[in-house]
Regions:
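Catalytic beta/alpha-barrel core
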Residues: 36-41, 120-121, 141-149
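Glycine-rich nucleotide/cofactor/substrate-binding loop typically near the N-terminus or early
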Residues: 12, 54-81
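Hydrophobic faces of well-ordered beta-strands that scaffold small-molecule active sites
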Residues: 6-10, 34-36, 62-66, 109-113, ...
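Glycine/small-residue-rich loop that forms an oxyanion/phosphate-binding "nest" at active or ligand-binding sites
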Residues: 71-105, 110
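A short alpha/beta connector and helix-capping loop motif
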Residues: 16-49
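Charged helix-capping and loop-helix junction motifs
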Residues: 124-130
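Acidic (Asp/Glu)-rich catalytic clusters
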Residues: 25-29, 50-63, 102-105, 136
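A contiguous pocket-lining binding segment that forms or flanks enzyme active sites
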Residues: 131-164
Length: 164
């Protein structure tokens, strides 16, 4: 029987500017993959750099955690946006974190949308499709992380069609 493992995953890198949020220094050594905020709902370039370095030091898989451009609402407020805007938001954030990781000799492993973007996608599969399209265009090796209890068959179909 093959060895099975559970991926312990956490949202991290959500501090920005002078504001420290979360317990990244304590949490990251305990997890196997990290969803790192990419600047729209939380995080900033310095926090992203520090969080990536901490994850690498602890052998933790790097993931982009793109959200809607909503610092005030922490990315938890729904917005009326088009699929093209969602693609732009996700492209920008994955690209930023991908560059931060590359400068430290690492690559991204996964993408897990944040907050309202995730919740909007649960209700609208076209949003999942838009996210998967961007992921495939950036790096087909990226894994789309979703919450337990999601419609697995539908999400697998979208991911397979998009090549992620």
């Amino acid at each position: 029987m093959p060895l099975q493992a559970i991926d312990l995953n956490s949202d991290v890198g959500e501090s920005f500017g002078n504001y420290t949020l979360g317990l990244d220094e304590q949490v990251i050594p305990l997890i196997s993959s990290a969803n790192i905020a990419c600047g729209y709902h939380a995080g900033d370039p310095a926090v992203m750099r520090h969080t990536v370095a901490l994850a690498i030091k602890n052998g933790v898989g790097l993931g982009a955690h793109p959200g809607l451009p909503d610092l005030v609402g922490f990315g938890r407020r729904n917005m009326e946006v088009t699929l093209e805007e969602i693609k732009d938001f996700v492209t920008y954030q994955i690209g930023a974190l991908q560059a931060v990781a590359a400068l430290q000799g690492a690559r991204l492993q996964h993408v897990k949308p944040h907050g309202a973007l995730y919740n909007m996608a649960v209700k609208n599969p076209a949003i999942w499709d838009a996210v998967a399209e961007v992921m495939a265009g950036i790096d087909e090796r990226l894994i789309l992380f979703v919450m337990a209890g999601s419609d697995r068959a539908e999400l697998e179909s979208i991911a397979k069609r998009r090549g992620v």
